[in-house]
Amino acid sequence: MSTDYDVVVVGAGIFGSCTAYNCQKIGLKTLLLEQFELGHKNGSSHGKSRITRYAHTEVEYVDLVGDAYNQIFELERIRGEKLWKKTGLLWVSTGNEVEKIHTNLKLKGIKHEVIKGTEVGKRYPQFKFDDSWNGLIDPMGGVIYADKWLNAFRDEFKKIGGIIHDREIVLSHSEISNNLFVTTNKSRYSSKKIIFTVGCWITKFLPDLKFNIEPISISVCYWKTKNESDSHLLNEDHYPVVIAQEMDLQVFHYSLPDTDYPGSMKFCYHFGDALTQDLAHPAQRSQRCIDLPAKFIQKYMPVVDGSAPTRIDKCIYTNSPDDHYIIGTIPTKNPNILVGGCGSGSGFKVAPGIGKALAEMAAGKKTTVDVSFFSANRFKPSKI
């Protein structure tokens, strides 16, 4: 078995799987390492559903989303498999976020529609907002079939010659005479490039970062309708993916149809509690992560039972100081070491675009999408 590679990708979540696939696709001999068994639920990439959307308050995200769509369309064609469902995105806000998104989408020529809060209920009877709210509909928004994305990128990676080792723990990485080495509990590999896509474990492998990385424990809540006869209003054919921002309260929520658990839609508070315990087994069920969605549902979603969630799952966000991704080199590290991380709860949809950009960087090429906005050079050294 070979121990010499062009690229070793550490971490086989969605960022790592997309990165490894794109590296191998452009001719880089690539090894993908995962500390847990494939299919584990210890990080940020498990579950059946995620949101995809062009709509963003920062225009720098839009082209990454477009690149991700193109890759998914290609995989659907190659595999003959449906990897997402176009439901449309409903973005509602009490502040001026809708205007920001409208400006960005107009600049990029992306089809969308701005509506008044009072008009939302006419489109989607699940909701009832007053004129203090504004809405935007992104028709290309939809449900990512998250588990299928992971399997697709890993399968295609292996089909074109990529190697995956799961249950293999990286112990260290080093540089000797301009060569990079990765030492695991099973072997030692040499590589021209190392790409870390390790989620909340980033500080384990890069402990000397000059800025703070914050892992967050998230409670993912699911809710049913008050009356079973209305349960169809929560399925993919009737329920959009949703971003809801109460800007006056600084409370942000997101929601998806009942893809994960039929009859129960996903509706979650977008933040959680700092994760200080075992990263693989985060604490969950912080009461505010239940109370805040419940309060919103009771106030704005008349057909949904907001008394208590039907189920609570766990997930981990990894946040950078400004909640944007980190893509590329780290100023204090060897330039042949790259990082793709800090998805901050929104990175799944752009993982194919991030993976392609990292692969192009590893090959010494100009990136198809400008990702300079996500460079770690934007951070000043932390005082902590």
From Swiss-Prot:
Enzyme Commission number: 1.5.3.1
Reaction(s) catalysed (UniProt annotation): sarcosine + O2 + H2O = formaldehyde + glycine + H2O2
GO BP annotations listed: L-lysine catabolic process to acetyl-CoA via L-pipecolate
InterPro entries on file: FAD-dep_OxRdtase, FAD/NAD-bd_sf, MTOX
Ranges annotated as spanning the membrane: none
GO cellular component: a single term: peroxisome
Keywords: FAD, Flavoprotein, Oxidoreductase
Residues modified to S-8alpha-FAD cysteine: 315
Cofactor: FAD
Annotated cofactor note: Binds 1 FAD per subunit.
Record bears the keyword RNA-binding: no
Residues binding FAD: 6-36
GO molecular function: flavin adenine dinucleotide binding; L-pipecolate oxidase activity; sarcosine oxidase activity
Superkingdom of source: Eukaryota
Pfam families the UniProt entry points to: DAO (PF01266)
Family per similarity comment: Belongs to the MSOX/MTOX family.
Protein's name in the database: Putative sarcosine oxidase
